[in-house]
Amino acid sequence: MTPEFDEEVVFENSPLYQYLQDLGHTDFEICSSLSPKTEKCTTEGQQKPPTRVLPKQGILLKVAETIKSWIFFSQCNKKDDLLHKLDIGFRLDSLHTILQQEVLLQEDVELIELLDPSILSAGQSQQQENGHLPTLCSLATPNIWDLSMLFAFISLLVMLPTWWIVSSWLVWGVILFVYLVIRALRLWRTAKLQVTLKKYSVHLEDMATNSRAFTNLVRKALRLIQETEVISRGFTLVSAACPFNKAGQHPSQHLIGLRKAVYRTLRANFQAARLATLYMLKNYPLNSESDNVTNYICVVPFKELGLGLSEEQISEEEAHNFTDGFSLPALKVLFQLWVAQSSEFFRRLALLLSTANSPPGPLLTPALLPHRILSDVTQGLPHAHSACLEELKRSYEFYRYFETQHQSVPQCLSKTQQKSRELNNVHTAVRSLQLHLKALLNEVIILEDELEKLVCTKETQELVSEAYPILEQKLKLIQPHVQASNNCWEEAISQVDKLLRRNTDKKGKPEIACENPHCTVVPLKQPTLHIADKDPIPEEQELEAYVDDIDIDSDFRKDDFYYLSQEDKERQKREHEESKRVLQELKSVLGFKASEAERQKWKQLLFSDHAVLKSLSPVDPVEPISNSEPSMNSDMGKVSKNDTEEESNKSATTDNEISRTEYLCENSLEGKNKDNSSNEVFPQGAEERMCYQCESEDEPQADGSGLTTAPPTPRDSLQPSIKQRLARLQLSPDFTFTAGLAAEVAARSLSFTTMQEQTFGGEEEEQIIEENKNEIEEK
C-alpha cells in the first residue's frame, strides 16, 4: 500500500470487500488489487537506467568483482543458509510449542486459520520434524567448499614436488592453521547461536506451561470456593459439615485468604499479558488485518473493565470494594478476562513468529533472529507467571489440605504415628455415625409428621390407602441409614476395643488367660454408663422387642413343661392373638421387621451389659437363634410364666442363660434377686441390678429335666408386682433410656391384654373374657 492510502478505498477481492459485498454495501470506492504491482514495476523501470551505465566501467574492475564474488560466494551462501535454518527452525519450534500447549481459545485458533493458515501446519508432525533447530553435529559437518579446498591443496602438493622442501612446510602449516582457526571460530559462533535459540525455545515452552498450569489452578480454586459456599449455605443445618462458628458467615467470607490470592494473581498476570500484547502491537506491527483493533481486548480502556484493574497499586480495602467482598461472580469475570488476554497474547506472538514474517536471506543477520524479538516482547512475563503460580499454589494447598482437615500427619516417632492413625480411625467412624444418625433422624421426623397427618385426616379410606405405598417407600429409604449407622458403630467399638487390648497388653497380661483368641478378658470393674442430659440419639430409641411371627400352636404342642387345662389353653391362645394384634399396630408406628440374626446381634450390642465388656468378635448367630431367641408373642404373652420361672430357678443358671436378652438397670434394693450368672461376671462390691429377662420356651428343656415347675399365676395377680418393679426402675437415677423404653413397651403390651375395654376386639370377645374372669374367681 502507498503512504497516501485512503481509508475509504477498499481493494477489490480483499476480505473486507467480500464482507461489505455480503452485507449489501456498494457505496465505496474500489481500487484494483494490481495497483501495488504496477507501482512496483514503475519503480523498477526508474531504477533500470543506472544498470545500463555498467558497461562504461573498466573491464578490470568487472573482472575483480567477479572473482571476489566467486571466492566469497560459497562462504556467504553457507552463512546465509545456516542463519536461515536457525531462523526457520526456531520459528517452527515456537509455533509448535504454542499449539501443543493448548493456550489458545477456539476463537483465536479460527482467527489464526483465517489470517495465516501456515501457522496451523507447523503443529503437524512431519513439518515439525523438518523444522527442528539444526544440531551441533549438522553445523560441524564440512560442506562442499571445505572439501574442494582440501582436495585442491592436496593436488598442488602432489603436482609440485618442490613444495616438499622443509622450509616451505612452515608457510603451508601456518596457512592451514589460520584456516582451521577461522573455521573453528565460525563454528563456535554458530553453535553458540544455536544454543541461545534452544534456550529461548525452552523459555517459551516454560512460559506456556506455566500459563496453562495457572489457568487450571485458578479453575480448581474457584471450584473449591464454590463448593464451600454451597455446602455452608445449603447443608450446614442438615449435615453439620461446617463448624458452627462459620455457619452465620456471609458466603464471600469463606476461604477469604484463597479469594484474595486468586484476585491478586489474576490481576497481576492479566496486566502483564496486556502490557506485552500492547508492546507487540506498537513495536512489531503487522498488516492491518492482523492488527485490527476489534480483535484485541488490550485496547479496551481499563475503566470500562472495572474490578480495580486501572490502579497500579491497590489496597486490600479498595480491592474488597471493587469486587464486592471478593465475591465469586467478580472472581469469575476476572478469570474470563485473564483467559481471553492470555490467549490473545499467544495468538499475536504466533502471528509475529510465523515463517511468513521471516526476513529474506540476504537481509537476515544475527540481530534479526526471532529469539531477540521473543526476549524483547516477553521481558518480565515469565517471571510474573511463575511467581503468581507459586503464590496461588501455596494458598490453594493450604486451604485444600489444612482448612478441610486433610493435612498429612507430621513426621514423628512410629509409635506416635500408629496411635494417631488409630485415633483418626475412631474419629472417622464416630463422625460417620453422627452424620448418618442425623440424616436418619431427619427422615424419621418427616415420616412421623406425615403419619400424624394421616391419622388426623378426615379423608376417605381410598385416599388413605393410596398413601400406604408412599410410606413403605420412605421406610425403605430409612433402612440404608440404619444399616450404615450400625456398621459405623461396630467399627468404632472394634477400634476402641483394639486400643484397650493393646493398652492391657502393655500393662501386663492377667494371670489366667483364655486360650481362645476370640475370648477377651473381662475387666474387674464394671464400667459405668453415663447418659448425657440431652436428646438421645436415634440408635437408643430403637425398640428391639419386635420379632418375626412364630407359630404359637406348635410351641404349645412341644411344651411338656406346663400342664394346663383346655380352658386355660384357649384363654392363653386368645391372649396371644390379642397381643399379636397389638404388636402389629406397634410395628407400623415404632419399628421395622428384623431378621433373627440381626435382632440377636442388636440385642447383644444395645441391651446387654455383657456386650460392653466383650469384644466384637465374630458371633455365630445360629445357636442363639435356635436355642435362646424368644418370640415376640412369648415375650408379651408369658410374662407371668417367666417371672415365676425366674423366682423358682435362681440357682439353676446354665451357659444358655448368658445368651438371653436382658433389660437391665441399676438398683441396689434388688440385690437379693440377682441370679448366679451376674455374680460370676461382676464382683460382689458392684451395684446390684434388676433384670427383666425374656426366655424362650425351649430353655427349660435345655437346662435339664430336674427343674421344678409351678402352675401359671393369673395375670391379674402379677400385674401389681410388675407395676411396682417399673416404679422402682423409674426411680433409679442410672436407669438408661433404652431399658426404660423396652420395659414400658412390655408393660403396655401386658396391660393391653388384660384391659377391660378392648380397642381392637369385638363384643363377642369381651363376653368371653368376662366369662373367663368369673371362672377364675370361682376357682
Swiss-Prot record:
Stretches that traverse the bilayer: 139-159, 162-182
Coiled coil: 430-462
Topology relative to the membrane: Multi-pass membrane protein
Chain segments carrying region Disordered: 618-719, 757-779
Chief localization: membrane
A Gene Ontology biological process term: cell-cell adhesion
Keywords: Cell junction, Cell membrane, Cell projection, Coiled coil, Cytoplasmic vesicle, Membrane, Nucleus, Transmembrane, Transmembrane helix
Polar residues composition-biased segments: 625-634, 706-719
Origin superkingdom: Eukaryota
Compositional bias ranges of the Basic and acidic residues kind: 638-649, 770-779
Compartments in which it is found: Cell membrane; Cell projection, Stereocilium membrane; Cell junction, Adherens junction; Nucleus
Keyword Transmembrane helix in record: yes
GO cellular component: acrosomal vesicle; adherens junction; cytosol; nucleoplasm; plasma membrane; stereocilia ankle link complex; stereocilium membrane
GO molecular function: myosin binding
Function per UniProt: Plays a pivotal role in the establishment of adherens junctions and their maintenance in adult life. Required for morphogenesis of the preimplantation embryo, and for the implantation process. (Microbial infection) In case of Listeria infection, promotes bacterial internalization by participating in myosin VIIa recruitment to the entry site.
Subunit structure: Interacts with USH2A (via the cytoplasmic region); the interaction associates VEZT with the USH2 complex at the stereocilia base. Interacts with myosin MYO7A and the cadherin-catenins complex.
UniProt record similarity statement: Belongs to the vezatin family.
Record protein name field: Vezatin
Record organism: Homo sapiens
High-level lineage: Eukaryota, Metazoa, Chordata, Craniata, Vertebrata
